[in-house]
Swiss-Prot record:
GO molecular function, one term: structural constituent of ribosome
Subunit structure as annotated in this protein's UniProt entry: Part of the 50S ribosomal subunit.
Name recorded for this polypeptide: Large ribosomal subunit protein uL6
Family designation: Belongs to the universal ribosomal protein uL6 family.
GO biological process: cytoplasmic translation
Keyword Nucleotide-binding annotated: no
Matching Pfam families: Ribosomal_L6
Purpose of the protein: This protein binds to the 23S rRNA, and is important in its secondary structure. It is located near the subunit interface in the base of the L7/L12 stalk, and near the tRNA binding site of the peptidyltransferase center.
GO cellular component, one term: cytosolic large ribosomal subunit
InterPro entries in the record: Ribosomal_uL6-like, Ribosomal_uL6-like_a/b-dom_sf, Ribosomal_uL6_a/b-dom, Ribosomal_uL6_bac-type, Ribosomal_uL6_CS
Source organism: Microcystis aeruginosa (strain NIES-843 / IAM M-2473)
Alphabetical UniProt keywords: Ribonucleoprotein, Ribosomal protein, RNA-binding, rRNA-binding
């Protein structure tokens, strides 16, 4: 039995779960999410909890058991409380602006980078250097945050770039520029 898959999913108050065959619909105060589960697993509602079970002991059923349990648990948590990812922008002159459903990033390129947010994902900017990505779908929030970070990932020499809040960037030492840097071995004489 899967360690993760066998754990029951508690259903909080104000959240309703509808199971129609392999389709699970979760409604809550933040919105509605729907997902079709693979046929290798089944989901059952038992009072105020959900149980994910697998149909047989095949390899695919065992692989998907814990995955489906986690996906459904994330749906329940998303419609109840939502998800948030925070990004920190570091660098001289680097800043962000939220314009409706767009995010405009000034991160050292010749032109500002404009990013359109997908449906169900909202973006807010604090102090022009902190970006908050939020929504009810954990996958969409994580993907959007990763795409924002991808615009200018943190570089190891000065640490400039976009990073997740709390992310530790391994720093490197730059070139040694002391003696011999001008006319040393192999250099111009």
């Amino acid at each position: 039995m899967s360690r993760i898959g066998k754990r029951p999913i508690p259903i909080p108050n104000k959240v309703t779960v509808d199971i129609d065959g392999a389709t699970v619909t979760v409604k809550g105060p933040k919105g509605t999410l729907q997902r079709t589960l693979p046929t290798a697993v089944a989901i059952n509602k038992d009072g105020e909890t959900l149980l994910v079970t697998r149909q047989d002991d095949s390899r695919t059923a065992r692989e998907r058991h814990g995955l489906c349990r986690t996906l459904v648990a994330n749906m329940v948590e998303g419609v109840a409380t939502g998800f948030q990812k925070r990004l920190d922008i570091q660098g001289v002159g680097y800043r962000a602006q939220a314009q409706g459903s767009k995010l405009v990033l000034n991160v050292g390129y010749s032109k500002p980078v404009e990013m359109e947010m997908p449906d169900g994902v909202s973006v807010a900017v604090e102090n022009s250097t902190q970006v908050i990505v939020s929504g009810i779908d954990k996958e969409a929030v994580g993907n959007t945050a990763a795409k924002i970070r991808e615009v200018r990932p943190p570089e190891p020499y000065k640490g400039k770039g976009i990073r997740y809040l709390g992310e530790v960037v391994r720093r490197k030492v730059g070139k040694a520029g002391g003696k011999g840097a001008k006319g040393g071995k192999g250099g111009k004489k």
